[in-house]
């Protein structure tokens, strides 16, 4: 007897993703973002892919001359939007990532599924937000130091550093960043020297408490410049 799974347009996203994962056993296994590219097509996905082609500073930060063939840069962008759009305060007034349960893959899947069919105006807003935030990041860190552990000689890109830098910079004015770029740079160096933070960017990085620790402590550094 042959078992047949029928995927309908209105099938639950977790069912679709599970079936794709079960089928994903070929010679070249698809990564998570390649699966999302199949499952969550729409204006949000298009916006992220267009940004990977158009934003030269972003490509320079990643040391890429062209978009990544397997959409790792697209995932970087989606991750930023998912984090930034869910920054909130808990009942104690601490900054946290609302709705995050410690499962990053599921969190990004849910975000893409919920926003895949955004309007053309929303798509343009996504692109403007990203471009403006990357511009601010480059003002402070340039393309060589952005999202790196600048407290050491390590030149690796840390998505875990981008997770708190990007949402915070989005909420700071360009004028504030231009006037305080040396202070911000130094503050990040000192922040990354904290043992607790150093552990958080490389160990159990998607754990809910660890994610919220990074956000809470970094946003607290800029309470005078960020309003939530």
Please state what every model-predicted region is.
Residues 1-109, 178, 182-213, 220, ...:
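Basic- and aromatic-enriched surface patches that contact anionic nucleotides/nucleic acids
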Residues 48, 130-133, 218:
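Short, Φ-rich (hydrophobic/aromatic) sequence segments
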Residues 70, 123-130, 154-162, 177, ...:
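Short amphipathic alpha-helix initiation/capping segments at coil-to-helix junctions
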Residues 94-144, 150-153, 161:
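Small-residue-rich helix-loop
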Residues 141-196:
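C-terminal hydrophobic structural anchor segments
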């Amino acid at each position: 007897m042959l078992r047949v799974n029928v995927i309908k347009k209105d099938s639950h996203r977790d069912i679709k993703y599970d079936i794709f994962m079960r089928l994903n056993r070929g010679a070249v296994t698809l990564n998570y973002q390649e699966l999302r590219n199949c499952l969550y097509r729409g204006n949000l996905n298009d916006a992220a892919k267009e940004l990977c082609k158009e934003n030269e500073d972003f490509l320079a930060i990643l040391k890429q001359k062209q978009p990544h063939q397997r959409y790792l840069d697209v995932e970087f962008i989606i991750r930023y939007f998912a984090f930034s759009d869910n920054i909130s305060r808990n009942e104690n007034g601490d900054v946290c990532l609302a709705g995050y349960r410690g499962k990053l893959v599921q969190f990004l899947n849910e975000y893409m599924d919920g926003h895949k069919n955004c309007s053309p105006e929303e798509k343009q807003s996504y692109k403007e937000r990203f471009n403006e935030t990357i511009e601010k990041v480059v003002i402070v860190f340039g393309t060589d130091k952005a999202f790196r552990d600048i407290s050491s000689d390590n030149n690796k890109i840390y998505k875990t550093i981008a997770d708190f830098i990007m949402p915070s910079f989005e909420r700071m004015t360009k004028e504030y960043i231009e006037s305080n770029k040396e202070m911000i740079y130094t503050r990040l160096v000192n922040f990354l020297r904290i043992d607790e933070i150093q552990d958080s960017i490389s160990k159990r990085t998607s754990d809910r408490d660890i994610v919220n620790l990074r956000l809470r402590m970094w946003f607290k550094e800029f309470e005078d410049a960020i309003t939530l």
